[in-house]
Amino acid sequence: MQIKDLKKSYNNIPALKGVNINISVGEFFGLLGPNGAGKTTTINILTGLVFKDHGNCLVFDKDIVKDYRYTRSKIGIAAQELSVDWFFTIEKLLYFQAGYYGISTEKAKRKVNELLDRLGLDKKRDSRLRQLSGGMKRRFQIAKALVHDPEILILDEPTAGVDVELRHDLWKYLKELHHEGKTILLTTHYIEEAELLCENVAIIDEGIILKKGSPKKLTKELGNSGLTVQIGQNVNDVDISPFLNDLNYTIEDSRLHFSVKDPEKAIPEIIQRLAKINIPLQSIKTETSSLEDVFLDLTGKSINE
């Protein structure tokens, strides 16, 4: 999937300002951003719900506008909002969804049974949608997205508002889908979710992609690590500033707190400097930045804002 210089405005207010994203076949990709950042607009353009103003979107090298029948057949979307007839059973709704893509009755039956079983909905197959809990509705959305067996699965906030147990169940299932070769695009409010599931992420804010890369790469390049060095005496009793004046550190009783980019390189250097002035070292504790720390530094906002 390729998104090139994608732009979109609503009432002359820019929602996307030249978004560029490449997602490889079989990749698990996360799109992170605060509310109103442009995540859902991007997804809606990919699935034909919103028309772009400028740019190109390709799915398996096919244009989403010129070759919309092909590209939409390759994508399944689990949207935030349900748009179905609430009076039918969930089994019937899944059969309808399969029919929209020309899936044969026999093949649809096998797929519907498989999805109901794997998503824990088998006992609810004869229930109407309005009778399901919020978590069950989320599962149904994923089943609906997968019933025509698309090669790309798009998930828009799939675990928002669900309990912890269900969230972990969905994470397990998404990992299985990824292992089976499914390409997955995820938007989420949960940084932990992106760190756990995604191979690569893009951080978007106010319609602009700020950074892209693996969670590990982003935290290493943009985050700061902390080192807490416990020594055997009160730091204030010793003048250590001449030996550490080029380092970013603070003092608290018998502890030194350092802010460093690379702990592996910093630790030997700090030990060596303290040894030169005979400072007894008792312990070293490391703390690394999280993807959430990087997100806050880049956007200046909470993920939920």
Kindly give the residue locations of the regions a language model identified.
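Conserved ABC ATPase "signature" region
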Residues: 95, 99, 106-124
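Conserved catalytic motifs of ABC-family nucleotide-binding domains
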Residues: 149
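Conserved ABC ATPase signature
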Residues: 128-132
